[in-house]
Amino acid sequence: MTWKLGDEEPASNGGRGTDDALTVTRILEASDIPCCLVGISALIFYGAARLRPDWEIAIPTELIGKAAQLLQSEPHSANYSLVEPWPEPSMSLLHTYHRFKGKGTNFYFILVPAQDVHIVCEPSNITRSLRGLPYPKLSVFIQSCLDTRNELQLCDVVDGTDLPEEWGEENLQLEGFNDVEWAKDINKRGCEFENGKFAHWSPFAWDAPKSRREMWQSKVRTKKDRLDWTKPDHVYITQYRIIGDPDPWTILSDDY
């Protein structure tokens, strides 16, 4: 069941907005703007049970202005409007980005500079859901979690995919540490945005070094520890995966 909010229609796919997001990505790609869905959307694609308020669409940083202008120009301005930025504190710069809303619906999306999620947004790094939505390849997404020291996302994608430890040794760059200089830049920009208006929300990224391999090992070795009495280990293999279930990204879903 979907609920109508005042005069607004629910987003597509029972309020999820999945086909709405697909339309936006196709508009961008038709104008030679590569893109991929990141943040909570990527976590859902890779099996995590998360609630998604807004769709985060990563775009090459140098093309953000072009994308924002495209969506505010005819004919697309008839369907989308620029709205107030993301209103809540978060370990990110979401509050500094272009945020759009589907006119007459409760579909929201945010244009995210790819450098701010430590992803190179190019076709070779992108895979697609069965609906055709673009997502970062699994190795690309997990590498970004390690490089940005986003251990919450890392935990969720590990539990959504149930990857073994050796997968990381074969597919990830585990030597060294998270990108401290990247984090310092994120924190600097977050604190300076609008003359320091949001500085009290800091930090926006963790800028202390931590071993990539240590982060990876600590999450893949503790999957069972994150089960509780509601998810017994004779039914669940991780907090998000039931034993024997197919990989979520291999099935057609209204969520992705």
Range-by-range predicted roles:
Residues 6-21, 59-97:
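Metal-dependent nucleotidyltransferase catalytic core
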